[in-house]
């Protein structure tokens, strides 16, 4: 079976609720939430994505797939764990060191959430080998 995770990044605020209902009818499996802080990446979507998560929390049971493209991963994890997402993916390169990567993995898993670890294409995959037994998904960014 194939799962579909639908990104809400380009949905206009005034259409979010209608769009969510249409995507439910289309049997999407997850809502993909692209969280950007304007520091780790150029765009800043944090406020609107947080607002979308609040809407989703009230109108649907479809699980969330949170993708954190942020510099301060620890604080953003806390902001999104309250929505009980299915998975939170964060960027290896956003962490100060490997200890911080493991701390974040543990924190996410302690909250009954799956963990995804994202890497930039130029990052040597060997750098994350030690984390593979502890994560559910590895995402190699190409954007």
For each predicted feature, which ranges?
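Conserved N-terminal beta1-alpha1 strand-loop-helix module at the mouth
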Residues: 1-87, 95-98, 102-103, 107-109, ...
């Amino acid at each position: 079976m194939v799962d579909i995770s639908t990104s809400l990044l380009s949905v206009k605020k005034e259409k979010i609720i209608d769009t969510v209902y249409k995507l439910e009818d289309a049997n999407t499996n997850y809502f993909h939430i692209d969280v950007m802080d304007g520091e780790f990446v150029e765009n800043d979507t944090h406020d609107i994505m947080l607002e979308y998560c609040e809407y989703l929390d009230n109108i649907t049971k479809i699980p969330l797939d949170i993708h954190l493209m942020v510099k301060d991963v620890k604080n953003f994890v806390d902001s999104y764990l309250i929505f009980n997402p299915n998975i939170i993916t964060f960027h290896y390169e956003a962490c100060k060191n490997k200890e911080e990567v493991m701390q974040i993995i543990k924190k996410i898993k302690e909250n009954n959430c799956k963990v995804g670890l994202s890497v930039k294409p130029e990052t040597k995959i060997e750098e994350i080998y030690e984390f593979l037994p502890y994560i559910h998904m590895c995402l190699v960014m190409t954007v």
